[in-house]
């Protein structure tokens, strides 16, 4: 019996690289499983349109949800608008293996209730500063996977990357994290492996 697609919530501050991560995952996985994407923006469908322009998925597999809410959550706390989008995608594509749900904001607890997402990925930006891991916000501490993005910017913004990783490790404890450069595709394989390992995602072999 099918339990339906794996639903993965992607959150993080504006500009951290959530849409780039979503795009890279689509490029890596679209030919290996049946997948779809839901993006959440405040008043526009900008992220959905960016994914369509990138042509990583057919347009009918991308849903742009306009939440009209606070930019720090951008997925309503009751999740109903996103649950409706999930249900619509499952009706349209009954064979779905994976749905990525990209938040427009960084409040992970409000963003992804357990009824909406099976796993959560939180993205932070190295350029946001050395002390981000030490602040230990809920997204950073509690997400199922933390992606520390734009590590190549560290020397340009005065961030000691070794210390940043040590602080990240301390903040995460036993929870996994990935040091990444999403634009270059660095870290994508580790995230795919996480989805297979923790989410039970079954993929066709690489071409």
UniProtKB/Swiss-Prot annotation:
One of its GO terms (cellular component) is cytoplasm. GTP binds at residues 12-19. GO terms for molecular function: GTP binding; GTPase activity; nickel cation binding. Keywords: Chaperone, Cytoplasm, GTP-binding, Nickel insertion, Nucleotide-binding. It comes from the Bacteria. InterPro entries: CobW/HypB/UreG_nucleotide-bd, P-loop_NTPase, UreG. Pfam families: cobW. It is found in: Cytoplasm. GO terms for biological process: urea catabolic process. HAMAP family: UreG (MF_01389). Belongs to the SIMIBI class G3E GTPase family. UreG subfamily. Homodimer. UreD, UreF and UreG form a complex that acts as a GTP-hydrolysis-dependent molecular chaperone, activating the urease apoprotein by helping to assemble the nickel containing metallocenter of UreC. The UreE protein probably delivers the nickel. NCBIfam families: ureG. Facilitates the functional incorporation of the urease nickel metallocenter. This process requires GTP hydrolysis, probably effectuated by UreG. This is Urease accessory protein UreG. It comes from Cereibacter sphaeroides (strain ATCC 17029 / ATH 2.4.9) (Rhodobacter sphaeroides). The lineage of its organism: Bacteria, Pseudomonadati, Pseudomonadota, Alphaproteobacteria, Rhodobacterales. The gene is ureG.
């Amino acid at each position: 019996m099918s339990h339906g697609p794996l639903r993965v919530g992607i959150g993080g501050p504006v500009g951290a690289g959530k849409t780039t991560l979503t795009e890279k995952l689509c490029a890596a996985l679209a030919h290996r499983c049946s997948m779809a994407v839901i993006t959440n923006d405040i008043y526009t469908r900008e992220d959905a349109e960016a994914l369509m322009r990138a042509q990583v998925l057919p347009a009918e597999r991308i849903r742009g949800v306009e939440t009209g809410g606070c930019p720090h959550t951008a997925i309503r706390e009751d999740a109903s608008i996103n649950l409706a989008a999930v249900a619509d995608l499952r009706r349209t594509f009954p064979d779905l293996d994976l749905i990525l749900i990209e938040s427009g904001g960084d409040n992970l607890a409000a963003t992804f209730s357990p009824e909406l997402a099976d796993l959560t990925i939180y993205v932070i930006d190295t350029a946001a500063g050395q002390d981000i891991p030490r602040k230990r916000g809920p997204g950073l501490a509690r997400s199922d996977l933390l992606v520390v993005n734009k590590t190549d910017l560290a020397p340009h913004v005065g961030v000691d990357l070794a210390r940043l990783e040590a602080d990240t490790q301390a903040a995460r404890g036993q929870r996994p994290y990935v040091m990444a450069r999403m634009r270059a595709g660095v870290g994508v394989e580790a995230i795919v492996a996480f989805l297979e390992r923790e989410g039970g995602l079954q993929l066709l072999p690489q071409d």
